[in-house]
Amino acid sequence: MKTITLNIKGIHCGCCVKNLTQVLTELDGVQSADVQLEGKANITFDENRVNVAQLIEVIEDAGFDATE
């Protein structure tokens, strides 16, 4: 397992946090996602099943901007 912190723009409220957490944790290979209102997400994932580019893509598909 690997844990990374991504910077996320566009998080405005608790609903954004909840929705983004759900989107990430539903992704195959993601063990946990701690999304913070301040625009950070700590994500623990299995590198053999998902990569950082896929995590960023899912975040962007949900309407947010993400960078490492």
UniProtKB/Swiss-Prot annotation:
The keyword Nuclease does not apply. A metal cation binds at C13, C16. Disulfide bonds: none annotated. Keywords: Metal-binding. One of its GO terms (molecular function) is metal ion binding. It comes from the Bacteria. It holds the Pfam family HMA. Residues 2-67 form the HMA domain. PROSITE patterns: HMA_1, HMA_2. This is Uncharacterized protein HI_0291. It comes from Haemophilus influenzae (strain ATCC 51907 / DSM 11121 / KW20 / Rd). The lineage of its organism: Bacteria, Pseudomonadati, Pseudomonadota, Gammaproteobacteria, Pasteurellales.
